[in-house]
Each structure stands twice: as structure tokens, then as C-alpha cells.
Curated annotation (Swiss-Prot):
Region described as Disordered: spans on this chain: 1-38
Protein function: Putative zinc finger that may be involved in programmed cell death and defense response.
Keyword Nucleus: yes
Classification of source organism: Eukaryota, Viridiplantae, Streptophyta, Embryophyta, Tracheophyta
Organism for this UniProt entry: Oryza sativa subsp. japonica (Rice)
Domain of life where this protein originates: Eukaryota
Full protein name: Protein LOL1
GO cellular component assignments: nucleus
Amino acid sequence: MVASRAPRSESPWLKKPMHGVSGSTAMASTPWSSMPPSSHSLGAQSQLVCSGCRNLLMYPAGATSICCAVCGTVTAVPAPEQKSSCNVHENKERLKGNTNGFRAPQRCARRVDGACTQVAREVHTEVALVIFTLLCVTLPGLLFSLG
């Protein structure tokens, strides 16, 4: 006789009662379901550039440091009230008008939560070149085809 398998939805590692939710039928499908509910489980996340490999990292809001899964570097998360020098807004205004005065942003990256954080110049230069290309090559061609 062949033993029958439990239906996939009844596997204990796929659905576990959430810790701290007593008398509820709330279920979680992650291996972290035994952790108490936090801002991470509610979906509040931020982004930061890894100080080692420059990959974009997503992390739960409120974290103080992040360990990169790619290179293993631990990057400190700046406090929300910590502001760094930021010239992105200045460059955005410059790009709206004349691109002759174009300068690549050098000092900050915008996080999802609105704070600024220090990153390498190479990251900004690549982003700035993409923006410059879109404004100078793609946009005029699009406007010409519409007109």
C-alpha cells in the first residue's frame, strides 16, 4: 500500500500560525512566521546601496545595519533624521531646462523613505548618463514623432 501525501497546503513549513496572534486564523507562508509581527511583516521597507559591492539592498524599516547577501559586507543604516549634502534636486531643475550646464550628482542617493545616504560616484555617474541619454536622445525623437 502506498502512503498518501498530505495536500501541499497542509505542509507545516508552508503555513504556520503567526506568533503573537492568539485565537486567530492568520497564517503566514514564510519561514520567519515564528517572529513577532513587525514593520517588516507589514511591508514597510527601505532601500540602501551596499557599501561593499554597490548592490541595491532592501531592508525592513527601523534596521540599524544591513548584511549584504551577495558580498557579506555590513552597511550601517543612517538615521531618518540624518541628512547628507544633496545636489540631486539642484540637478533635476537644471535638467528640466538647458542640458549644457549638466552635472552628474555626486553625493547622495534617494532612499524609499526619503532620506539621503552616501554612495559612490560611479553609481550616480551611470544613473546620470542614463537620464542624460533619455533626455537628449529618446525624448526629442518621441516629441518629433508626436508632432
